[in-house]
């Protein structure tokens, strides 16, 4: 199949541009899973993979699939409609088909004039559940860059969603509370990792209850600080899709079009900056960290030539012996897959928790050095050969959460100095400026986490280091 696909690509590449506007690809040898491609005359680089609904029993290929192609193409967006296979109790079948489609579009970015950093997903009804599953569960390579969800099935709890979709997707696992929770995607939204979304539905949908599905997903996105828009139209029932007969069709098209126009599009040529860290990087305790955390403020300072991503995860340690080691997180795997050009490593605060120093002191220090080196080795092995900056943690003013500032100064900061010297890496000193903030105006009330003003100070320190 792979050989046939690349042969097809060769043929497509050799044909005149005007001759190749739409085509079909088999994702499985028997053609049970197919990808219908519609390429725009004037591509913007953006692409969307469309997943029609049908309760995981059938597919509404026209109204929720190919009929959307003219709209997207008119905006310069490449449209790929997926005919995915029904799960029949094996959820890996449709998930695998959808992930295959996402990877194929990204892998073919050059041939199809697509920006691999701007490939979204759209799903309607059960297709919305499949789309949100990729957005919340898939690895970096198959995860979409944005979501468009029409009246989506989100919950896998039969009492609050479309029962047929639950039966089709989970099969015999529909009564397993762990599986129900795992694939109720409002419970799986991950800050900084789940992509932005727009959700569109009708108030009087009798098939997929809005409150426990689309609105629940919006609420989860808002709680996690992930950008999300919600449109609930007064009427329309379920399945209005692309139909012009939908009373609010023109308004819906305008809403979707405006959202797409305002959605940031990151480019391959941008300098990619990965901010690795704990809750201080994550933006714990501040309102909308996607807008106000230090990585977000750094993005504003650096401008459009840079693409800054926040890979902070609360409570994480550098030390593998800690309770929650950072390198065990999806965020770490994402940071590597991001192929950054610059990496800011701001870990160590949670390593100053006394519970992580219960073993022999020297053993812990040796382990910390080893784990810093492991992270650096993984980053330097990337094909982008990123410039790595190590940072001293900010001062801990209060022993909140069991943290101890003296461990920072006597053990962790000296360890960072040693590792930086060994690897000839620059250091960004965040400890000294924050230790001089005696009125704690840069901190939240816990004396550990920076407020918005403190996040701006952190961003300024990083910005100054990058501009040297």
Where are these regions (language model features)?
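Short beta-strand/loop motif that positions the catalytic acidic residue
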Residues: 198-205
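Alpha-helical cap/lid subdomain in secreted, periplasmic
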Residues: 180-181, 300, 304, 326-468
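Conserved alpha/beta-hydrolase "acid-adjacent" motif
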Residues: 206-213
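Primarily recognizes the serine-hydrolase "nucleophile elbow" in alpha/beta-hydrolase
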Residues: 100-165, 180, 185
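Short beta-strand element of the alpha/beta-hydrolase
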Residues: 45-53
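Serine-esterase "nucleophile elbow" of acetyl-processing enzymes
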Residues: 68, 266-312, 331-339
């Amino acid at each position: 199949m792979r050989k046939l696909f690349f042969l097809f690509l060769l043929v497509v590449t050799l044909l005149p541009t005007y001759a190749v506007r739409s085509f079909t690809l088999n994702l499985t040898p028997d053609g049970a899973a197919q990808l219908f491609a519609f390429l725009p005359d004037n591509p913007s680089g953006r692409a969307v993979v469309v997943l029609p609904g049908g309760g995981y029993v059938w597919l509404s290929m026209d109204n929720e699939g190919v009929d959307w192609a003219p709209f997207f193409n008119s905006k310069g967006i490449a449209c790929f409609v997926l005919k995915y296979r029904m799960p029949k109790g094996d959820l890996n079948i449709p998930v695998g088909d959808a992930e295959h489609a996402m990877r194929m579009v990204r892998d073919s970015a050059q041939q199809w004039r697509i920006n691999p950093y701007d490939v979204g997903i759209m799903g309607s009804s059960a297709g919305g559940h499949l789309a949100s599953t990729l957005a919340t569960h898939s690895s970096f390579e198959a995860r979409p860059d944005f979501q468009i969800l029409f009246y989506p099935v989100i919950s896998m709890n039969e009492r609050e969603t479309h029962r047929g979709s639950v039966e089709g997707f989970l099969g015999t696992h529909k009564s397993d509370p762990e599986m129900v929770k795992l694939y109720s995607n409002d419970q799986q939204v991950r800050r900084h990792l789940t992509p932005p979304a727009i959700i569109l539905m009708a108030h009087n949908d009798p098939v997929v209850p809005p409150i426990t599905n689309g609105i629940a997903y919006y609420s989860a996105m808002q709680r996690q600080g992930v950008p999300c828009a919600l449109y609930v139209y007064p009427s329309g029932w379920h399945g209005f899709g692309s139909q012009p007969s939908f009373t609010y069709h023109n308004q819906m098209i305008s809403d979707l079009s405006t959202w797409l126009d305002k959605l940031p599009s990151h480019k391959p040529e941008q300098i990619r900056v990965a901010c690795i860290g704990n809750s201080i990087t994550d933006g714990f305790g501040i309102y909308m960290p996607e807008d106000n955390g230090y990585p977000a403020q750094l993005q504003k300072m650096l401008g459009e030539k840079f693409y800054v991503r926040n890979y902070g995860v609360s409570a994480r340690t550098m030390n593998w012996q800690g309770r929650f080691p950072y390198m065990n997180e999806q965020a770490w795997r994402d940071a590597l897959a991001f192929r950054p050009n610059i990496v800011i490593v701001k870990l160590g605060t949670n390593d100053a928790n006394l519970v992580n120093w219960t073993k022999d002191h020297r053993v812990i220090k040796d382990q910390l050095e080893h784990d810093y080196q492991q992270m650096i080795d993984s980053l330097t092995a990337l094909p982008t050969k990123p410039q790595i900056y190590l940072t001293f943690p900010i001062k801990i003013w209060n022993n909140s959460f069991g943290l101890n500032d003296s461990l920072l100064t006597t053990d962790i900061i000296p360890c960072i100095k040693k590792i930086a010297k060994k690897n000839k890496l620059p250091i960004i000193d965040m400890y000294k400026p924050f230790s001089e903030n005696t009125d704690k105006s840069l901190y939240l009330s816990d004396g550990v986490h920076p407020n918005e003003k403190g996040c701006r100070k952190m961003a300024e320190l990083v910005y100054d280091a990058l501009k040297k």
